[in-house]
Amino acid sequence: ARQHVGNEPFAVLLGDDLIDPRDPLLTEMLALAEHTGESVIALMPVPPEMIDRYGCAEVVPLEAGLSVAGTGLASGEATNQVRIKSLVEKPAPEDAPSNLAIIGRYVLQPAVFEVLERTQAGAGGEIQLTDALATLATMPTEQGGGVTGVVFQGRRYDTGNQLDYLKAVVQIAAERSDLGPAFRDWL
């Protein structure tokens, strides 16, 4: 991917995380990345017993008074924008720094490629993006580091989970203006 994005920030959207396209999550993430010059990850609260399925974030509110262009939000003032202090991949519930799971939306700065090259295999014996992001979170913004997050409260389906996949198909089909009425009648 490095040769395609060059020295520009880029978005990564994992295919098994389905988020309502009408939701402004990615728009907010792009605006935050442009404003801060840092990578941005999407986070979502999950029950403690599910945190071991996800990367997990330790966060603090963004600095009060930081206006985030294009979002109409000022961080630190009852917003959903946070600074990432640390990240851990698939922690045991008792070791998790929070209940904020990393979900499949990222806006990454190009420095992530160099960090990934230096990242050792982690959870599952694989090089984990979460581990590279944890390193970026400790680096100065001037070096491509720093990571912020947007806490998502909208509708999301993990289509790698069979039940969530079925829920997504039914819900989205039922809401379509062209197919919804006939589909709902059939149901």
Give, region by region, the residue ranges found by the protein language model.
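Catalytic-core segments of class I nucleotidyltransferases/pyrophosphorylases
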Residues: 11, 30-34, 63-66, 78-184
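Conserved beta-loop-beta/alpha segment of the NTase-like Rossmann-fold superfamily
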Residues: 1-60, 65, 108-110, 116-119
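Low-complexity, intrinsically disordered Ser/Thr/Pro- and acidic-rich segments
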Residues: 69-73, 77
